[in-house]
Amino acid sequence: MATKRDYYEVLGLAKGASDDEIKKAYRKLSKKYHPDINKEADAEEKFKEVSEAYEVLSDPQKKAAYDQYGHAGTDPNYGGGAGGFGGFGGGGFSSSGFGGFEDIFDSFFGGGGGRSVDPNAPRQGADLQYTIQLKFEEAIFGVEKEIKYNREDTCATCGGNGAKPGTHPETCHKCHGSGTINVERQTPLGRMMSRQTCDVCHGTGKEIKEPCPTCHGTGHEKKAHTVKVNVPAGVEDGQQMRLANQGEAGTNGGPYGDLYVVFRVEDSDIFDRDGAEIYYDLPVSFVQAALGDEVTVPTVHGDVKLKIPAGTQTGTNFRLRGKGAPRLRGGGNGDQHVKVKLITPKNLNEEQKDALRAFAKAGGQNVTEQQEEGFFDKMKDAFGGKKKK
């Protein structure tokens, strides 16, 4: 089993990075490696690695434990975790079915002192992943979505044992229920014993003489499954929610796997968003900026009035407190940031031009106007008749 990389290293950060640095690094890397976007072979593994790192470092308690004890402080083998919302997850993966170091050692040397895996022990089913598309406003305020997907369910005909009703699986005659057999091989070091999966029962430890007519001996059947997902207010693009026991059926009576719902949020036509903060560019005429005005500003919570002071410059920022998105972990709403964008008028009529000339003259400005070309001048230019200066 590969050694886990340092979580700070995974996110490209130094130890002790701030919450904002952790969040920004996660958003950048989760988008880069998301399987829906990145089709490289190792993208899914990197995505899961990034998500796992963020799940720990974004939680103050887990981060403190990790900073003090490393992976030992957050390893799930040290205690179970409940379902919930966070940055951790992935699709089509499960840790069930992997033995420990003792199993690997035992498979090479056929040792009798190491522990063995019971092939008939309950095993959790595989996890699944589902992507939900959200409108910008749905992510802000939350919404209930009903999703449908196919998953492996426990076979209703045989109850999951794979045998025809009225019959039962029998202990494998070759491996005697262990799921593995010892094989003697000739190696450069001489003849050695190794352990491999039983070729009769394929590691299950059981033989099914009369398979179930529905699942054909697998114990599972593919079925459509429907789940209602309560999308929390303030969810961001790329974040995930774990729905416990909504994945695929387990084996030998093991629990269902989990479903990881990935949220993809559409862009807004007028707003930008960074976490709970929302940004809006406000178009303002130079007259409004010079003389001041009261304008209407759209927010996700409805229109509000904003006073523009006289002499406002382009690029000036105003803050509308509480008009941003809800903070996912509580603490109210973020703010909306309004940036003034000065609009220069085009296609002025003569009256407007005269007014501007008078304004410039009153201010002591000497403006050299650029004259527009007439129709015949443009025709000359098109046919190379423009005089060289």
UniProtKB/Swiss-Prot annotation:
Pfam families: DnaJ, DnaJ_C, DnaJ_CXXCXGXG. Zn(2+) 1 binds at C155, C158, C212, C215. Belongs to the DnaJ family. Participates actively in the response to hyperosmotic and heat shock by preventing the aggregation of stress-denatured proteins and by disaggregating proteins, also in an autonomous, DnaK-independent fashion. Unfolded proteins bind initially to DnaJ; upon interaction with the DnaJ-bound protein, DnaK hydrolyzes its bound ATP, resulting in the formation of a stable complex. GrpE releases ADP from DnaK; ATP binding to DnaK triggers the release of the substrate protein, thus completing the reaction cycle. It is found in: Cytoplasm. This is Chaperone protein DnaJ. Disulfide bonds: none annotated. Binds 2 Zn(2+) ions per monomer. SUPFAM superfamilies: Chaperone J-domain, DnaJ/Hsp40 cysteine-rich domain, HSP40/DnaJ peptide-binding domain. CXXCXGXG motif repeats lie at residues 155-162, 172-179, 198-205, 212-219. GO terms for biological process: chaperone cofactor-dependent protein refolding; DNA replication; protein refolding; response to heat. GO terms for molecular function: ATP binding; heat shock protein binding; unfolded protein binding; zinc ion binding. Keywords: Chaperone, Cytoplasm, DNA replication, Metal-binding, Repeat, Stress response, Zinc, Zinc-finger. A zinc finger (CR-type) spans 142-224. Residues 6-70 form the J domain. Signal peptide: none annotated. Its cofactor is Zn(2+). Its main location: cytoplasm. Coiled coil: none annotated. Zn(2+) 2 binds at C172, C175, C198, C201. It comes from Enterococcus faecalis (strain ATCC 700802 / V583).
